[in-house]
From Swiss-Prot:
Heterotetramer of two alpha chains (FadB) and two beta chains (FadA). Its main location: cytoplasm. NCBIfam families: AcCoA-C-Actrans, fadA, PRK08947.1. It comes from Shewanella loihica (strain ATCC BAA-1088 / PV-4). Disulfide bonds: none annotated. PROSITE patterns: THIOLASE_1, THIOLASE_2, THIOLASE_3. Belongs to the thiolase-like superfamily. Thiolase family. It comes from the Bacteria. GO terms for biological process: fatty acid beta-oxidation; phenylacetate catabolic process. One of its GO terms (cellular component) is cytoplasm. SUPFAM superfamilies: Thiolase-like. The active site is at C91 (acyl-thioester intermediate), H343 (proton acceptor), C373 (proton acceptor). This is 3-ketoacyl-CoA thiolase. The gene is fadA.
Amino acid sequence: MKQAVIVDCIRTPMGRSKAGVFRNMRAESLSAELMKALLVRNPQLDPNTIEDVIWGCVQQTLEQGFNIARNAALLAGIPKQAGAVTVNRLCGSSMEAIHQAARAIMTGMGDTFIVGGVEHMGHVPMNHGVDFHPGLATNVAKASGMMGLTAEMLGKMHGITRQQQDEFAVRSHQRAHAATVEGRFANEIHAIEGHDANGALIKVMHDEVIRPETSLESLATLRPVFDPANGTVTAGTSSALSDGASAMLVMEEEKAKALGLPIRARIRSMAVAGCDAAIMGYGPVPATQKALQRAGLTMNDIDLIELNEAFAAQSLPCVKDLGLMDLVDEKVNLNGGAIALGHPLGCSGARISTTLINLMESKDATLGLATMCIGLGQGIATVFERA
């Protein structure tokens, strides 16, 4: 079976969805800028050999509709003979794009893919046009479509306190800010145009959504937002609403080597799994267990982990049941996570994978895991191995 590898991986800065730096940039433009950048960064690659562009996006309507993958590819000047498809596994969409490219390579159905994803949550809100079938209420808890309430449920089931959530959120902001100041995001962020508060055109080079001033004292003043009477989940311990895109060049290993392109990571194993929709945030646990089993590994073999932080109340039960509570500061989200950086839905899977690969390189780590929960009760996981 052929080996799928990551040749390159980049992302945009994460922009704040409310009046942020990308308020005048469309989702197709965010995507196209990254596609173009991958080609510029890897001049040995002939664009005419691209088999397919596989792009994750959740809210596929308005500017994100009508197959945004194809729209962005055409904007980027990718040759018209290359295919393009938009995929939707909700929060796991761009990791699903990675998996689809990897499976195609493994089975000989192409050797060069551009993958990634985008979500402009400022232009197309997460709940835009959502209309659940009434019949779902017969066997699915009615609150399952309200992500914050599923986090409340999962946190209560695992005894996660408000204090623990606040501490986890502060850590996310502190680590993301430190990574920014120390230049640890520089290799993964592709600077693109945006607009400052006065409307002037600027080159956006850093994430906008990190709040370095976040403290336990400031978070303690916030009221529960999803269950005001009895809850513990606040806006401060939830992933920020943000706009962004991420992209990867995924190739068959021998093809990449023949072109003299770098092999930044191999895709060692992949998995998806389902769980009860009422505790959708638990999905990373069964997905990770399945991915590790397929790779013949245990959690002890994994050097670094990127776990998408949908909510602190959701992340901590996953960390606990994956046996990582005592290893968080050694292995988990060392540059912060979505609580600080935001969670542009269709972008996040490739974003956390990009951050993971860069961390693996900087730490000289061998094995890394990227995993995330998915709305309505799924999880997705990928094990990467440095060549």
